[in-house]
Amino acid sequence: MESRAITQTPPARSRRRASVGQSAEGSRWEALRSSPLLLSTIVCLALAALSAAILPTVPSYDPWSWIVWGREIVNPHLGFSTGGGPSWKPLPVLFTAPFGVWTAGAPTLWVITARTGGFLSLVAAYRLASKLTTGAPWMRAVAGVLAAAGIVLTQEWSYYMFRGTSEPMLVGLALWAVDRHLDGKRGTAFVLGVGAALIRPEAWPFIGLYGLWLWRRDPRLRWLIVVGWASIPVLWFGPPWVGSGQPFLASVHAKDYNGHLGKHPFLEVLRRGADLQILPMLIVAGVGVAIAWFKDRNKLWVGMAAAAAGWWVLVVAMTLDGYPGLERFYLPAAGLICVLGGASVVRIAQFVSSWLSARDGWAQRATLVTAAVVAVLVILSIPLSTSRINEARAQEPIAAAAVKRLDHLAAAVRAVGGHKGVYPCKVSFAAVNHGVQTALAWKLAVTLGRVGTSMRHSGVMFVGPRDTIDGSPPRIDPRLTQQKLIAQVNEWKVYRQITPGHTACVGG
């Protein structure tokens, strides 16, 4: 008997559904591939979430204040007050407000968000340095890796990443704005620039000028420009006005901060800008820009260098106007310098190679010479970068100690009865080491103004070690002469500090 192979052809409708499903899946993947920012964000968000699971994760002083303000915005039972803490920053609170709905997870969610921005800055640095570099793919890859490494080795970068500050996110926004502009995505570039302007005021002139250029270049985006421009003053000045009655409170707080600029603020702020990125990166960036201009008249290189210089000018001018001139204010400029530096290492190597190739017998060795010069430049930079490498390695145990310290502070809060134990009345008061004031306000579910860094009234005083995590213990008003230890949890001591006879509404 002859056997027959029997096959079953699926109905036409099933074939169409399968085809449509495959087509939809393919189109989604193509959409991701065509949107490097979206794809990078997904990957960096996953990395940030993973880092929160395996690395110490706790906010530092300023981020705790943003988390407190976010909770106040979404919680009708808490008053919204921007006094008693650091300067207001709009962009972080746009994230921490929705995070505040999930109180327990808000601090971790914010740190994940900040780290996502930091990882994105490294991707953007890689992309930009690769775009600045011509030649073989390995040359573009080397330029990108060196640029990203330069950012990682900027001063305090690892601290910012561990502790959830906004600076890595700021660098990411600035570099991705440049990347999107170069790829012709001008609307996205403008939105990213607005995001940077909602973190640092130095970005305001840049987004203003870019918006004017875009207004003439692409009339379809004028509505976006108007909304973006309007959002900057509304979000910077509106919430402080509502929360304190002072729309310019952020500026007041910033000017009140002691920047320790010494007798020569101008020279000191310049030194800080130069010291932010590692010295080899600054040097090779300068040499690379010079080669790009005098050899090729490359406007892109010079434009990026001019943007970095312009940011420097703004930081210096604001410092001379009374602002503290901290190193981190320069970070977007440092990001551009690292991009130029990474590309410059390859550019310098190519320049040397082309010079040697003009000689007999060297033309066939151009690639080898380029690789050798890159290797020499990298090796020469290592001794000048070891201190930053050591600083970066030290941040993990420091962050782990901070996690443990704040866990002990939370236990001390529970030991004295939590919010009700510390604040039996609306006028009750508490104080703590200045470095954890905002963290204690979060744990006690109060506004920042109800937790002091000095015992100026009768109340409850939390005293921890004097170190880089907690800062100095609270100063005590001389009138508060009676002190009673009411709890001790590990390194934390909790006192009831009062003026004799004034015990009403004192917790503990």
Task: Label each region the model flagged.
Residues 42, 141-142, 226-234, 284-285, ...:
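Signature aromatic-anchored transmembrane alpha helix within multi-pass, membrane-resident enzymes
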Residues 8, 137-138, 175-189:
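Membrane-interface transmembrane helices that cradle and orient dolichyl/undecaprenyl
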Residues 367-437, 443, 447, 452:
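Membrane-embedded, lumen/periplasm-facing catalytic core of multi-pass transferases
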Residues 161, 167, 199, 205, ...:
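Hydrophobic/aromatic-rich transmembrane helices and adjacent perimembrane loops
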Residues 211-214, 275-305, 309-312, 347:
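Hydrophobic, aromatic-rich transmembrane alpha-helices
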